[in-house]
């Protein structure tokens, strides 16, 4: 880019955006299906996919934030009134918070239930705490409302 003002989002920013959306479109119905299934091989398979997709969304969101920090975003519409630009910035911030909250709470719910999680580059297991697991499950479900 020859100037310091971006006229549109880069192809990588667009990729992060649309890939995250596609993962969420797959992820949310899987979560609703999981709560209706009894324990079975099908439930384990769907839950494993749900966890892998969730951890992927977590990493993609972190990459998006790092990329956003080091790259230029297009300027907001100068003709828009101040409140509209402020709302746009707050909306982006809230979506990042919601994405990180829903993924982090899902991860912590699994870990406090005594399960070991594979984070692609390392495995993690912590001491069981079922009360905390229930609290993180509630946060996980409630944060879905804000996506």
Identify what each model region corresponds to.
Residues 1-145:
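Membrane-embedded alpha-helical bundles that constitute the cytochrome b-like, heme-associated redox core
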């Amino acid at each position: 880019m020859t100037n310091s003002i971006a006229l549109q989002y880069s192809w990588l920013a667009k990729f992060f955006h649309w890939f995250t959306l596609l993962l969420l479109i797959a992820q949310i119905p899987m979560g609703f299906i999981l709560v209706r299934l009894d324990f079975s091989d099908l439930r384990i398979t769907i839950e494993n996919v749900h966890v892998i997709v969730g951890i992927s969304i977590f990493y993609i969101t972190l990459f998006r934030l790092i990329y956003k920090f080091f790259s230029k975003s297009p300027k907001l519409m100068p003709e828009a009134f101040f409140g509209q630009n402020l709302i746009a910035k707050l909306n982006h911030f809230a979506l990042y918070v919601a994405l990180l909250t829903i993924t982090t709470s899902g991860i912590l719910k699994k870990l406090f239930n005594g399960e070991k999680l594979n984070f692609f580059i390392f495995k993690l297991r912590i001491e069981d705490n079922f009360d905390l697991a229930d609290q993180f499950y509630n946060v996980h479900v409630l944060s879905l409302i804000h996506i």
